Amino acid sequence: MSDIFNQQGLKSKFSNIVKNEGQGDSDIREVFNELARPQAEVGRDIEYSELSQALNDNSVKVFRPQPYDELVNIPFIEAASPRMMALYGELLDSKDVSLPVGSGLHIPTYKPGHEVTPPLLTLPNSLSYEYMHYIANSANDTWDKQIYETLKELLVAQATNRFSTGSLLGQVKRVAAGQDVAYGRKGHHKNKSFKEMGITPYRVMEWLDEYMPISDDEPEITLSNTLDWLVYTPEEAELMGVPDSLPDITQSSAAGLPWLGKKKGEVAVSALITANMLIKDVSQLLKENLFTGSNNPLDPKKEGVAEVTTKNPRRAADQFSRQVLDRIIKEYSYTMMGLLFPKGERYAIADHLTKTRNIWSASYVTHLIGSTISDQPAKRMLNVLTSTSRTPSLAKFSPTQGGMEALINIILNATDIVELVYADNAYIYYPNEDIWYSIDLTKGEANCTRDVAMTTAMYLLTRGWTSKQGTPIYNYTWAYLALYGIPYMTVDSISVLKNFQIKNPGQGSGNPWTFLNNHVLTTILMNKWSEIGKPQPSPDVIEKLASMTGIDFKVELVVTNFREKLIAASRHSIPTSNRVEPRTIVEMDMLGWDVTHTEFGFTPVLSKERLFKSIACPQPPSSTFQTSVAKQVHKYIQNVALLYVGAWAYPCIAQTIEGYALNHWNTINIMIRNKEYDLDKAIGKAVEASPFSEVISLLSLDRPMHEQNYAQVLYQQKTIEKKEAKPKVSNPLYKRDKETYHEYTTRMARMRINDDMVGPQWEPIINLVTKLYPREATGENQKSRESMTRVKIRGLLENMERQLESNGRSMDVWYNAYLTGKKPSGVDKKLATLLVLLAPKRTKKLPSGVYQKLLGYPPIDKSPVPSLTSDEAYLYDTNSLEYNRIAYVSKLNEDDITVYANKYMVYSSTLLSNLLPDKVDWPELRSMNVEGASDPYQVKGYKKKELKPRFGEEILDDEPTGKKSSSEKRRLQRKGQKAKLQRQAATGTTFVRKPLN
């Protein structure tokens, strides 16, 4: 290395390149290190003792602290439902679970740490070495200068930025800035309700049909039960092909409240039980309110969402919803609390004390329920490339494997204005003016209102959780959780910092619906922009739209002569293997990507600002990478990812990053030599933790990633499959335009009587009941009918195999009944009827994916509807029959929620998602003044008699005894039950835990 730095000819060549900067005689290493040297020190942060003053100085709203029941350890076998015992009984037989059911009350305290990570200190010297090699072999002065300017940008990025978790003061100022946006302070526009904007949820959903389309495929599950039914036993998992249908959970992420300090993987079963407690409580409360009143099945009070008045039924719906929310939040206050977590990011040193991005780390319970509602619809979202109908959506868009090429071709061929939308980002291209705009909402999360979240929920339910015929496959419990529960828990909710409970403006960033709600906001903005003629976003237009919608936004990037620059890039196409010639890279800022042209067509390159900050200020490995080998694997994947997402496009930088990756790989090989170490597992974990995991996961683990032909894998164009979006159908379950609410409820009640159980999966059961038990099946007493149906069918199914065995028969009898559709001879008449009715109808028009799931491998015939060999047909028929048998048995043994709710699934869930009140009177929390307070317990609003010390902490005491409301009596009754539960758990006394509902 010393030889190349001391070659006089190269030193002179470098001096000529930098002579205009007054550094002509300097050594290149000195120049590069000087460029990377920070010009300012990181500012001093405040202490936690100064937090109350900082909150007050920045006018941050603080709530009166809400307590929740303390955690207690309870033996798993005493807290688990029969389903949970079937799933985890053997594994957790002697273990405890941690549940928030203690008799004491707890107020959380959370103090996140803030740390600044040093930059990549070897970067200046490594770049100087590669650059000297570059100019030694270069005969093009223009290229030499251009490469130097690029390296200079990278080094300046290192001088001015650091990877850190920000500062406490930066967190406060970020919250204050969000409140400024939400409340219209300091020049911002106050958030507006839909009524103030002149729109309705139904109008917005019509826009979302175009801006956030969902495919016509049906979800893999029904949204109708507690979460433990989405986890499968080994037998069920073998048939389903997956261990569970829960949303993907990052096990290493924080569990949130009430499990403060724990990872999700550590409390997964406890969280599942607690979430089920909440779901059951909501179900019970809805039963008490929905299905009470007269015995007349057409009575609105019995079948409606509240006591309907002829004047304003929507107000009744609002009153009903508020009552349920009040009771739920008293028991589960932690579900609307999020830890205010400082996001690790590359921050400008100058912004250290003013800008720290906050992540709202939701309760695991809130995360589970919210993700379950959104997961299946989100998987089926379509975008501008995958939808057969027009959409500007970029949801699930990937620029790799031909995605960028296809998108750029749409832009190049455009004759009308092109608009694209992704979360809080929008992109507009004006072909006549040849100008590209990248637009970003100003702290978009703060613009989110509960109107927006309710509309998101209604869209997910009516588009994502309906059959192809438009029939709901969700019940009223989940409809309520989606429409009222999650919006209340995640929007204008509580952020915990120290022992302060801060009003979170808008939605908590990082909640399960962050992307969806932001996408709805941008959809509203873009449609209002369309209404005024789609003008270019000048300052006057921005002000006009912000005044109309209450949504503040800014133009992040303007690219003039955009098409011209793209065409120039295509004419200057350079192969990905060329790491000598500077490329033509066109700025787009499209989801963080720019574009160049290679042998694969238009190819994505990570935007320079993001790429250079990531190289100069690498993110340190998290605490989950504990061993020295794991940390090396993390650094290896980090450099491989940076090389493949963009560093490859910049000479000298590509060689530097490739050298780092190779060094880390060699170090790993030395460290694991003569040791047993699962390197593939470690690499997989590092890939999963990478911010570029979607890109890097396309590569193989069969050989070192730095040795693979990354360009062939990442950028080779592949066929993009297009799908039909869910059509806009005339659904008989929706209220008709000229129909009064009384007429609607009457019609729906009649429909409920005629259609007790919906969906083809219920047809055999309906037929069975009708034929075998006509009196019970057609009886007017609906409660008796439900009980009789459930008991009789369950009994028959449980005894079916035993009856066959007692007659010397096997399950082949059922199989033959399935194939022939005829009742088997020599079997009891009722049993023979049952065997035929429970045999699913066979079809020869199923897609190959269904055959693959039931065969266990793809059919040899590659046609969309494959023909099967006789052996394959037998295997398919047998597995199909067994799958349906297990599905029926599981459905009939489900928790009481589904058994009860399926009868009313069509009617009640449709009402909940169509009878939205004009304005919801959400329960509001009390705020308090923090001026001059050292802790939130001593401020005005608390009386000393309300506080008492327990275990060294100050907590709320019971209110004085007196006349109490029914809801308060219920809360105290449950508190007494929990106290008994806690005492028994502490003494080891055996007890049976009663279901909450």
Curated annotation (Swiss-Prot):
Residues 960-970 have a biased composition (Basic and acidic residues). Keywords: Covalent protein-RNA linkage, GTP-binding, Nucleotide-binding, Nucleotidyltransferase, Phosphoprotein, RNA-directed RNA polymerase, Transferase, Viral RNA replication, Virion. Residues 950-997 are annotated as: Disordered. Its EC number is 2.7.7.48. The keyword Calcium does not apply. Gene3D superfamilies: 6.10.140.300, Infectious bursal virus vp1 polymerase domain. May exist in multiple phosphorylated forms. It catalyses: RNA(n) + a ribonucleoside 5'-triphosphate = RNA(n+1) + diphosphate. The keyword Phosphoprotein applies. Its main location: virion. GTP binds at G256, L257, P258, W259, L260, G261, K262, K263. One of its GO terms (biological process) is viral genome replication. This is RNA-directed RNA polymerase. It comes from Drosophila x virus (isolate Chung/1996).
